[in-house]
Amino acid sequence: MRGYHYQEDLRSLRPYIREYKPVLVGVDGGADAILEQGYTPDMIIGDMDSVSDQALRCGAEIVVHAYRNGKAPGTERLKREGIPHVVFPATGTSEDVAMLLADDKDAEMIVALGTHASLVEFLDKGRSGMASTFLTRLRVESKLVDAKGVSQLYQPRVSTWQTLLSP
């Protein structure tokens, strides 16, 4: 997702990403945000309406979020371009699907970047479908950390050679 301040939040996570090498999941246009910062997404989840061709061809696993009835308009584009993908029918938003998949794969921590985390952002979205987001947050709440929190709490490790070279 490309929520408020996503670029500066992603930049602030550089040391964390360098040290922990987390699985990077781009939700829709969030895949392009990951690429803009010099990283490659491991997985892209969404309806694929706002994902660039570059992102779709970066080697990430592509999961098309389909409607409950299985219809996924984004698959036409992927089929036409010959891009391998998986269709995942689910209610809720693509962001919800990403968090639930991470939870299902036993992620120890889900660092949310560019999501609609505050009450203002949540309400600003203005969709009735946001109820699923509330339920998803209840499900993953013990694992979910906002990127701003990680960047403020994370302290990079100092390696031995850095200590030896210090004046």
How would you describe each model-predicted region?
Residues 25-26, 46:
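Short beta-strand scaffold positions
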Residues 9-12, 36-39, 55-57, 122-125:
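Short acidic, glycine/serine/threonine-rich loops at helix termini
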Residues 98-101, 109, 113-167:
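C-terminal functional extensions of proteins
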Residues 7, 50, 118:
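Short, electropositive, low-hydrophobicity segments enriched in small/polar residues
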Residues 1-24, 31:
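N-terminal glycine-/serine-/threonine-rich phosphate-binding loop
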